[in-house]
């Protein structure tokens, strides 16, 4: 019995038709692990940064018709919410598990906070080849950093700084069949390795 990881069939919760039925599927197949990951990595980030982190499992409370296409647990230093702060995420779409750190368009002082990515531009480029960027958290698209030109990357960061709807996340994503989801030990190791790469951007 696994505690933290997800099986390929768990991702099929996103195929369930209808809001209520899909929410039931998320509650059964995905949320228990997100809650456990929330506890584990809140302690991890608190230990790594010296700041108290809180987990925020997506509630999808505003939805009244359309079922969610993704779900997640986010980590931030505010107990009441995470969207206003730079934050870490573990989440899922139907075809991927993703891990991210960055800034949403709703963040306070977004222009100032997003400049960390400008200052750490070289560090972004030096991330391992399977690291990506996400420029819209509502979409599954996450191009590999290695496939972007310098100008592409600069433009993406500038958009997060200067455009109201702009966002910027560094990310990693794996498929539901990935071997790193086969056991809790492998999954936690993958997540810790990823967050170790993200943390210098948080503390910068």
UniProtKB/Swiss-Prot annotation:
It holds the Pfam family DUF1054. InterPro entries: UPF0637, UPF0637_domain_sf. Gene3D superfamilies: Protein of unknown function DUF1054. Belongs to the UPF0637 family. This is UPF0637 protein SAOUHSC_01054. It comes from Staphylococcus aureus (strain NCTC 8325 / PS 47). The lineage of its organism: Bacteria, Bacillati, Bacillota, Bacilli, Bacillales.
């Amino acid at each position: 019995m696994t505690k933290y990881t997800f099986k390929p069939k768990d991702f099929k919760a996103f195929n369930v038709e209808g809001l209520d039925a899909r929410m039931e599927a998320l509650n059964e197949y995905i949320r228990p692990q997100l809650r456990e990951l929330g506890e584990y990595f809140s302690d991890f980030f608190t230990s790594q940064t010296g700041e108290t982190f809180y987990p925020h499992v997506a509630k999808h409370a505003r939805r009244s018709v359309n079922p969610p296409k993704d779900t997640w647990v986010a980590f931030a230093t505010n107990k009441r919410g995470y969207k206003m702060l730079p934050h870490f995420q573990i989440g899922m779409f139907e075809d991927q598990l993703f891990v991210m750190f960055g800034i949403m368009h709703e963040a306070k002082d977004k222009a100032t906070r997003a400049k960390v990515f400008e200052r750490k531009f070289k560090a972004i480029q030096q991330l391992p080849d399977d690291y990506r960027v996400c420029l819209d958290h509502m979409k599954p698209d996450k191009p590999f950093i290695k496939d972007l030109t310098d100008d592409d990357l600069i433009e993406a960061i500038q958009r997060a700084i200067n455009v109201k709807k702009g966002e910027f996340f560094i990310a990693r994503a794996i498929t539901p069949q990935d071997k790193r989801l086969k056991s809790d030990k492998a999954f936690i190791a993958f997540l810790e390795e990823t967050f170790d790469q993200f943390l210098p951007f948080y503390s910068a």
